[in-house]
Design a protein with these regions (language model features):
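Long, compositionally biased intrinsically disordered regions
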Residues: 1-5
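Short, Lys/Arg-enriched N-terminal segment that forms or immediately precedes the first helix
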Residues: 7-27
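N-terminal helix-turn-helix DNA-binding core of bacterial DNA-binding proteins
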Residues: 21-62, 83-95
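Juxtamembrane/membrane-water interface recognition
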Residues: 35, 72, 106-108
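Beta-hairpin "wing" of winged helix-turn-helix
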Residues: 51, 72-83
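Residues within the DNA-recognition helix of helix-turn-helix
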Residues: 66
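Alpha-helical DNA-recognition elements
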Residues: 69
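Conserved segment of winged-helix/HTH DNA-binding domains
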Residues: 88-109
Length: 109
């Protein structure tokens, strides 16, 4: 048996504003040390998985898994190496990184 609760007034809190949702998604991506470190490494330019793994002291497959999450979030994308198309390099999507930064700053101000 379900009892309805009386309505006392308008709720003070509603659904989060879109900028809060965006900031939450960005914060979720950066909440992991490895993902945050990958984004910091990629600030210097395109880098392959093996170079990131060596710099971070992580295994290649772990870095690849984190890159997949960052790619799904739109923060990074893969590019083929000019001299050897077998090699994938990752780079930041600077527009997406700037949008994530702006979303976080809007919420934190």
């Amino acid at each position: 048996m379900r009892t309805e609760l009386p309505v006392v007034g308008e709720p003070r809190l509603g659904l989060p504003a879109p900028d809060v949702v965006d900031a939450t998604a960005a914060a979720g991506m950066l909440a992991d040390r490895t993902r945050a470190s990958i984004l910091a490494l990629l600030a210097s330019g395109p880098t392959c998985v093996c170079e990131m793994a060596a710099a971070l002291g992580e295994r290649d497959n772990n870095v690849s898994n984190h890159l997949a999450k960052l790619r799904d979030a739109g923060l990074v994308h893969a590019v083929r190496h000019e001299a050897n198309a077998r090699f994938l390099y990752y780079e930041r999507d600077e527009a997406a990184v700037a949008a994530a930064r702006a979303a976080l700053m809007d919420v934190l101000r």
